[in-house]
Curated annotation (Swiss-Prot):
This is ATP phosphoribosyltransferase regulatory subunit. GO terms for molecular function: histidine-tRNA ligase activity. Signal peptide: none annotated. The gene is hisZ. It holds the Pfam family tRNA-synt_His. Keywords: Amino-acid biosynthesis, Cytoplasm, Histidine biosynthesis. Belongs to the class-II aminoacyl-tRNA synthetase family. HisZ subfamily. Coiled coil: none annotated. GO terms for cellular component: cytoplasm. One of its GO terms (biological process) is L-histidine biosynthetic process. Disulfide bonds: none annotated. The lineage of its organism: Bacteria, Thermotogati, Deinococcota, Deinococci, Deinococcales. Pathway: Amino-acid biosynthesis; L-histidine biosynthesis; L-histidine from 5-phospho-alpha-D-ribose 1-diphosphate: step 1/9.
Length: 406
């Protein structure tokens, strides 16, 4: 066994600056923050419940490295933190999961078996403060991916799973479904050239009628086509939107998109999931190739969940969604998911009995009853346990409330 010399730093020693002085801990970079125990417990309890739900649907867990090779073609390449290792290789901190999942599938499951259902959870880092699921530069996601299959049933499964995940958190959410290819097909069917379509995509995505009119005049778009473009920006609402979209669909691609969404809607209804549709979604969704969706809840104007269908390298179909843990935990009702009560245990035997009964237990460090009572009240611990008996903390007579082994 190696002997530790007096010059070796102890594992619990304070970090030292180059001059031997303790490092300052008073400041943090913009976009990161400390997470205190109450929030941590709430977030991690939610993470555990979501992971268990995904497992119950057949989604097996994988873990992915936080460090990746920097890739200029990465969808978040311009937003990723980059660093150089000792060999001069440029690395990047993980900035999203779908690309990493694609690499994992290609490396470890090139032949399936498909469909492949995977779940993940962990931190992401973004150099900028904008992302689909958070304004922080360091944040947590839990997600699910369904790889190797496509079609109505696969899309409906993910929508139903997303709905179940939000229900696990006890929130009332609206699932908004889009299909970016519908707008692209409508613009193509209108006979507009590529550069004009590119300019119009952005205006439609922002639902800017003024910009649409300006671009239409600049590029000589006919009044009839301009009216159709305005109609695209208004395709938001319940299933009646699909009826309106059928009228605007003048080509095969647009018609196929509407029929697919109609079939997905019917399948989702069978699963008890109600959908809203936003068919004016255009280029907001990067690499997605089919159906897309987001979930919104009252009290926050950013989505707590987002996902859609995409193609992995080699054309393998995939679809999935990610949940922003910080956002969902922030709007989750108190006590949902339910958490076990934590009690103050006066000895090891009491702690063991409490934990065996499904309670959390903190072990007393002193025999001073007044000090323990003060601590329990400050921590919000309602009861303490001695032997196999749970006792109220507040009453002076410590009246027995119940028994652990009852």
């Amino acid at each position: 066994m190696r002997r530790v010399s007096v010059s070796d730093p102890l594992p619990f020693s304070a970090p030292l600056a180059a001059g031997g002085e303790a490092l300052s801990t008073s400041a943090l970079p913009a976009g990161v923050r400390d997470v205190l125990p109450a929030e941590w417990e709430r977030r991690e309890h939610l993470r555990s419940h979501l992971s268990a739900l995904l497992r119950s649907w057949g989604y097996r867990g994988v873990d992915l490295p936080a460090l990746e090779l920097a890739d200029p073609a990465h969808p978040q390449g311009n937003h990723a933190f980059k660093l150089i290792d000792s060999g001069g290789q440029v690395l990047a901190l993980r900035s999203e999961y779908t690309t990493a999942l694609g690499r994992l599938v290609g490396t470890h499951f090139p032949s399936g078996p498909f469909p492949l259902r995977l779940q993940y959870g962990g931190r992401l880092w973004l150099r900028t403060q904008t992302s689909e699921l958070g304004r922080l530069r360091e944040f947590n996601q839990v997600g699910a991916e369904l790889i190797g299959v496509t079609g109505v049933q696969a899309d409906a499964e993910l929508l139903a799973l997303a709905h179940a995940a939000l229900g696990q958190a006890g929130v009332q959410a609206q699932l908004e479904v889009g299909f970016p290819g519908f707008v692209d097909a409508a613009l193509t069917d209108a006979g507009l050239p590529g550069p004009v379509r590119a300019a119009l995509h952005d205006a439609i995505d922002r639902k800017s009628g003024a910009d649409l009119d300006l671009l239409a005049r600049q590029h000589g778009v006919s009044p009839e086509v301009t009216r159709t473009l305005h109609s695209l920006t208004e395709l938001y609402g319940g299933p009646e939107v699909l009826t309106e979209a059928r009228v605007l669909a003048r080509g095969v691609r647009a018609e196929q998109a509407v029929e697919h969404l109609s079939a997905v809607h019917a399948a989702a209804q069978e699963a008890g999931v109600e959908l809203l549709f936003d068919l004016g979604v255009s280029r907001r969704y990067g690499y997605y190739t089919g159906l897309t969706f987001r979930a919104y809840v009252d009290g926050i104007n950013q989505p707590v969940l987002g996902g859609g269908r995409y193609a992995l390298p080699g054309g393998l179909p995939g679809a999935g969604f990610a949940i922003g843990l910080e956002r969902l935990a922030a709007v989750m009702p108190a006590g949902v998911p339910s958490e076990p009560e934590t009690v103050l245990a006066l000895d090891f035997a009491a702690a063991t009995a409490a934990r065996a009964a499904g309670l959390g237990a903190e072990l007393a460090w002193t025999g001073d009853e007044a000090e323990l009572r003060h601590y329990a009240q400050a921590r919000g611990l309602r009861r303490w346990v001695q032997g196999a008996e749970l006792r109220d903390v507040t009453p002076a007579d410590l009246k027995i409330a119940t028994e652990v082994n009852a």
